[in-house]
UniProtKB/Swiss-Prot annotation:
InterPro entries: Ara_Isoase_C, AraA_central, AraA_N, AraA_N_sf, Fuc/Ara_isomerase_C, Fucose_isomerase_N/cen_sf, Lara_isomerase. It comes from Shewanella baltica (strain OS223). The gene is araA. It catalyses: beta-L-arabinopyranose = L-ribulose. This is L-arabinose isomerase. The keyword Lipid metabolism does not apply. Its cofactor is Mn(2+). Mn(2+) binds at residues 306, 333, 349, 448. GO terms for molecular function: L-arabinose isomerase activity; manganese ion binding. The keyword Manganese applies. GO terms for biological process: L-arabinose catabolic process to xylulose 5-phosphate.
Length: 500
């Protein structure tokens, strides 16, 4: 079973009538076999749909139009089995609004040395057919991923899957609705931004709602539904008997369950995939949602604290891209440092870290929340699972958006954190904290990020290219002088690209 049950990518092979029916029959047969191989592979998480070979400008235009109008199609894989004159592709590529990947492969891995003849050479022509197609893509300035190698290899299939996941994320971005309860934290700069510009570039919509509307949904929750929700908590988390035997703590837990159920219904009714709130805007609420927000994220909803709608969007998009993979995705904040032999960052937030990143079964506890509404709030406590991860931040630079990515290595804390009443993750940025933090700051990266152990750098590269957004990567090879030059060069490129 594919991780993406409804979404699909189309596989379109280019050729021309010049070759005659016998060769075109072989082209179609080979294409169907490649599609079958992709669909049988566990490495590719999305259904690949075979489409008949296109041999003329009209056929190419028609399949591009059809891809645009099919809600389940998130992108198109294009392969030139033979030579397909690229002027035939101009109208179709101009029409195509879905992302496309150029697969530069051939059906057979090895040459039949003893038997090869001109019939074979004329049938298996992707070595120069794909170069012709590549030219027109470059001439038309079309962003696309080019995957090179034999279609049966693990590396090629992994790249195909990375692109499919990015296409699913881009599709989600085009359809995403984000609900904002309250505004940004007062005086904070980086969480601000141009929502109209974001909708133009990324597709997602951001809508504001009053706390009164949310409270109406919360107050409509029935007592028996709250009781059933408490039973779910008991089955999913480690909860002490003390909490259940303490009338006050149990009441706080019931109020949190009520918030979760009301908020869930509000988001469902409005078809929202992400939301934000702010501890400064909680009129009428019993507290800042803690457990409620954590559980919503665990169920795939994006979240951004203090009104951070850009991070909420990215958390949701990355959760969609990561379907079926091990590891989770969460809203995150760089909170405090551990300077030592290897400098480290302790990431956390006031309450809202997703349990999908937990190393062990989370504990559900009630602790005092001292910012905004000062009250006791139920929350899940855990530490993040060790392993590779990434932090992704989206910022508004005024004339464009920039996505910043830092590769990390999450580690197991050397000691317990018995007095820390929030979930956390401890990581070592690549190449090290000194360079990574300096680069992040030079790039303008936010203190909030979308943290993930399910998504790779390549997924974000593919997504950023689909969005036409600037992306800067901080990894093991980053050096500050070169990084600052990259930022300067990007400023010129993206400034000129708008007018070219």
């Amino acid at each position: 079973m594919k991780a993406f049950k409804q979404k699909q990518v189309w596989f379109v092979t280019g050729s021309q009538d010049l070759y005659g029916p016998k060769v075109l029959e072989q082209v179609a047969k080979n294409s169907e076999q490649i599609v079958h191989g992709f669909n049988q592979s566990d490495a590719i998480s999305m259904e690949v749909v075979y489409k008949p070979t296109v041999k003329s400008p009209r056929e190419i235009y028609a399949v591009c139009q059809a891809a645009n109008s099919d809600e389940n199609c998130v992108g198109v894989i294009l392969w030139m089995h033979t030579f397909s004159p690229a002027k035939m592709w101009i109208a179709g590529l101009n029409e195509l609004s879905k992302p496309f990947m150029h697969l530069h492969t051939q059906f057979n891995a090895e040459l039949p040395w003893a038997d090869i003849n001109m019939n074979y050479m004329n049938t298996h022509q992707s070595a120069h057919g794909c170069r012709e197609f590549g030219y027109i893509g470059t001439r038309m300035r079309k962003e696309r991923k080019v995957v090179v190698g034999h279609w049966q290899t693990n590396d090629v299939q992994a790249q195909v899957d990375d692109w499919c996941r990015a296409a699913a994320g881009w599709n989600e971005s085009q359809n995403l609705r984000i609900a904002r309860f309250g505004d940004n934290m007062r005086q904070v700069a980086v969480t601000e931004g141009d929502k109209v510009a974001a909708q133009i570039q990324f597709g997602y919509e951001v809508h504001a709602y009053s706390l009164g509307e949310l409270n109406d949904a919360i107050n409509a929750v029935a007592d028996n539904d709250i009781t059933a929700q408490i039973d779910r908590y008991a089955s999913e988390y480690v909860i002490s008997n003390e909490l259940f035997n303490d009338e006050y703590q149990l009441d706080r837990l019931r109020k949190e369950a009520q918030i979760e159920l009301g908020l869930t219904q509000f988001l469902k009714d409005g078809e929202f995939g992400a939301f934000t709130n702010c501890f400064e805007n909680l009129t009428g609420m019993t507290g800042l949602p803690g457990l409620a927000t954590q559980r919503l994220m665990a169920n795939g909803i994006g979240y951004g604290g203090e009104g951070d709608w850009k991070t909420a969007a990215m958390v949701r998009i990355m959760k969609v891209m990561g379907q079926g993979r091990t590891g989770g995705t969460s809203f995150m904040e760089d909170y405090t440092y551990n300077f030592g032999v290897t400098d480290q960052v302790l990431g956390a937030h006031m309450l809202e870290v997703c349990p999908s990143i937990a190393a062990a079964k989370p504990r559900l506890e009630v602790h005092r929340h001292t910012i905004g509404v000062r009250c006791d709030v139920p929350r899940l406590l855990f530490t993040g699972k060790a392993g590779p991860a990434i932090n992704v931040s989206t910022i508004d630079l005024g004339n464009r958006f920039r996505i910043i990515l830092n590769e990390l290595d999450t580690v197991t804390p050397p000691q317990e954190l018995p007095n820390l009443p929030v979930a956390s993750a401890l990581w070592e940025p690549r190449p090290n904290l000194s360079i990574a933090a300096a680069a992040w700051i030079h790039a303008g990266g936010a203190h909030h990020s979308a943290y993930s152990q399910a998504i790779s750098t390549d997924n974000i590269v593919d997504f950023a290219e689909m969005a036409g957004a600037e992306l800067v990567i901080i990894d093991a090879d980053t050096r500050i002088r070169q990084f600052k030059n990259e930022l300067r060069q990007n400023s010129v490129y993206y400034g000129l690209a708008r007018g070219l």
